[in-house]
């Protein structure tokens, strides 16, 4: 999911 692409970096859409 696009919002989990940067899960290790706060997330792409998590902040």
UniProtKB/Swiss-Prot annotation:
What GO annotations for molecular function exist for this entry?
ATP binding; metal ion binding; methionine adenosyltransferase activity
Q: Name one GO cellular component term.
A: cytoplasm
Q: Cite the annotated pathway.
A: Amino-acid biosynthesis; S-adenosyl-L-methionine biosynthesis; S-adenosyl-L-methionine from L-methionine: step 1/1
Q: Which cofactors?
A: Mn(2+); Mg(2+); Co(2+); K(+)
Q: Please name the GO terms of the biological process aspect recorded for this protein, alphabetically.
A: one-carbon metabolic process; S-adenosylmethionine biosynthetic process
Catalysed reactions, as listed in the record: L-methionine + ATP + H2O = S-adenosyl-L-methionine + phosphate + diphosphate
* Keyword annotations: ATP-binding, Cobalt, Cytoplasm, Magnesium, Metal-binding, Nucleotide-binding, One-carbon metabolism, Potassium, Transferase
- Is Transferase among the key words of this record? yes
| Subcellular locations according to the entry | Cytoplasm
Family note = Belongs to the AdoMet synthase family.
Q: What else is known?
A: On the 2D-gel the determined pI of this unknown protein is: 5.9, its MW is: 43.3 kDa.
Per the entry, what this protein does is: Catalyzes the formation of S-adenosylmethionine from methionine and ATP. The reaction comprises two steps that are both catalyzed by the same enzyme: formation of S-adenosylmethionine (AdoMet) and triphosphate, and subsequent hydrolysis of the triphosphate.
Q: Give the record's subunit note.
A: Homotetramer.
Q: What is this protein called?
A: Probable S-adenosylmethionine synthase
Organism for this UniProt entry: Zea mays (Maize)
Record lineage: Eukaryota, Viridiplantae, Streptophyta, Embryophyta, Tracheophyta
């Amino acid at each position: 999911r696009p919002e989990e692409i940067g899960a290790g970096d706060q997330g792409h859409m998590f902040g």
